[in-house]
């Protein structure tokens, strides 16, 4: 089934099919494809830049798997919790082929369970959070296009030239589930704000800005806090345009997600100001990442092999190539020391 989507002010129209392709009779939806593309981009970024954060790429595999799986489950749980009585069975609650993943649920679950996984695997938590925050921006920027193919998560009427119209937007705006501030009038026959596009652009711009800032970060967790501030500010504004949000205070149009976004922004600004002042004048030093092989070998010895000196850490502002070279040399040195210690023990 196709859906005609129009942008009258731009003279553009698209025939969209929610199904991207079929494998063995199973339909693969564009919604899932968009999420998968975003996830792949996030993974590529994480593995490419992990050493610059002092994170061993092999050690973070388990963290990523746990964070992704439980993050998706949390995203669905958050979405269902916002309107639990509209589902007739448990199967409807867990079905995500038609959409229904709440980003904030995924963010909360990803950070929470990912943090626990970091403790389990011996991965530094805050540096991993910084990598994750960058990945979230890529994933969210791509994932929002799944809403476009599903024709969901759009806003109220607009006269702007990029206003969007389709039979899906019209049908939804004629339903009883529309949520808008008290006094706001909705015309189902007029174009609406493509809020999925706003959020996608906001996330990609945020990724670009934070990517430029990586080498200038002042402390571990700096990128994470700036992500919370940036995404929260954008989400607060964009959420106010949408017509499918759970209202917290209908009289003033305050949504639940706006409250969460507002808390994230305020808390993020407060924490950023505090830690920036605390670490003022102190350049961030990143410990070189010990690989999984050396970590496992150290556990067999009486104590860890460590080396004091400048060759065990680098300034966060150091180029990626230097991190690669120094990390490789450091792990070779540790491996040799472990082998020597093992021979003495034998």
What are these regions (language model features)?
Residues 1-346:
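A feature for loop-to-transmembrane-helix boundaries and adjacent hydrophobic helices
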């Amino acid at each position: 089934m196709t859906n005609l989507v129009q942008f009258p002010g731009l003279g553009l129209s698209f025939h969209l099919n929610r199904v991207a392709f079929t494998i063995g009779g199973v339909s693969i939806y564009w919604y899932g494809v968009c999420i998968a593309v975003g996830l792949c981009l996030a993974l590529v970024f994480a593995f490419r830049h992990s050493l610059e954060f002092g994170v061993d790429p092999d050690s973070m595999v388990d963290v990523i798997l746990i964070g992704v799986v439980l993050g998706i489950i949390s995203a669905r749980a958050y979405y269902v919790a916002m309107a639990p009585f509209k589902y007739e069975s448990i199967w409807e609650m867990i079905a995500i082929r038609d959409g229904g993943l709440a980003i904030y649920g995924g963010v909360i679950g990803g950070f929470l369970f990912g943090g626990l996984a970091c403790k389990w695997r011996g991965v530094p938590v805050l540096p991993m959070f910084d990598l994750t925050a960058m990945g979230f921006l890529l994933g969210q920027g791509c994932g929002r296009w799944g809403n476009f193919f599903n024709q969901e998560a759009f806003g109220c009427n607009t006269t702007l030239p990029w206003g969007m119209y389709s039979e899906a937007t019209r049908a939804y705006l004629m339903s009883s589930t529309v949520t808008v501030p008290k006094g706001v009038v909705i015309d189902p026959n007029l174009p609406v704000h493509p809020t999925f596009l706003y959020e996608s652009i906001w996330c990609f711009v945020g990724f670009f800005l934070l990517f430029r800032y990586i080498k200038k970060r002042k402390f571990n967790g700096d990128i994470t806090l700036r992500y919370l501030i940036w995404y929260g500010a954008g989400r607060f504004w964009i959420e106010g345009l949408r017509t499918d949000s759970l209202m917290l205070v209908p009289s003033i149009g305050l949504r639940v997600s706006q409250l969460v976004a507002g808390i994230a922004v305020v808390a993020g600004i407060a924490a950023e100001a505090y830690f920036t002042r605390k670490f003022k004048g102190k350049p961030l030093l990143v410990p070189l990442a010990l690989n999984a092989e050396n970590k496992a070998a150290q556990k067999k010895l009486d104590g860890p092999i460590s080396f004091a000196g400048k060759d065990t850490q680098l300034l966060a502002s150091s180029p990626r190539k230097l991190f690669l070279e120094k990390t490789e040399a450091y792990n070779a040195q540790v491996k040799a020391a472990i082998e020597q210690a093992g021979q003495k023990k034998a």
